[in-house]
């Protein structure tokens, strides 16, 4: 890949968007493999807790959790790609997007057992670092539980009904 000609240690990750799964002609996993060069491909999926508060595409928190799980299910397990969830709480003050939404989202995806992590956006882009400490406080409070979930559920298979959604419908 071209990135290797600049620096073979540079790692490029892909942030998914909705259209990449259906009508862009290439999905995030394929793009990540193409751009990774000699490094491990990295994908941050799309679907964030702030969607629930804003009712983006009329989604509630449980819909967004299942959207990310569906996107993760499209990854071929033979592919060695690091996959992160989008833990965005834009625009970040708790009165807009409760910290509980971020923690519930993180908890559910850890219990899924197939994510390599979550990119938690816990700081406001423009405000003082003391402006909104609750996201970080809740994250720290839940650390022991998060670690236990990762150990207890990591690598296990979900059972039950799986609604099949085709990739690349257009």
Predicted feature residues:
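Hydrophobic targeting/anchoring helices
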Residues: 11-170
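Active-site groove signature of glycoside hydrolases
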Residues: 1
């Amino acid at each position: 890949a071209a990135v290797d000609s600049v620096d073979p240690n540079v790692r490029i990750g892909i942030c998914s968007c909705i259209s990449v799964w259906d009508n862009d002609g290439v999905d995030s996993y394929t793009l990540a493999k193409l751009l990774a060069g000699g490094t491990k491909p990295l994908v941050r999926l799309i679907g964030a807790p702030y969607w629930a508060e804003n009712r983006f595409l009329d989604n509630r928190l449980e819909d967004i959790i299942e959207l990310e799980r569906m996107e993760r299910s499209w990854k071929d397990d033979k592919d060695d790609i690091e996959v992160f969830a989008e833990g965005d709480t834009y625009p970040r003050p708790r009165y807009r997007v409760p910290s509980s939404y971020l923690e519930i989202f993180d908890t559910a995806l850890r219990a899924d057992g197939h994510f390599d992590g979550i990119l938690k956006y816990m700081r406001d882009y423009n405000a003082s670092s003391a402006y909104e400490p609750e996201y970080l406080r809740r994250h720290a409070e839940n650390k022991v539980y998060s670690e236990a979930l990762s150990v207890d559920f990591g690598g296990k298979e979900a059972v039950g009904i799986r609604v099949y959604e085709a990739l690349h419908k257009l």
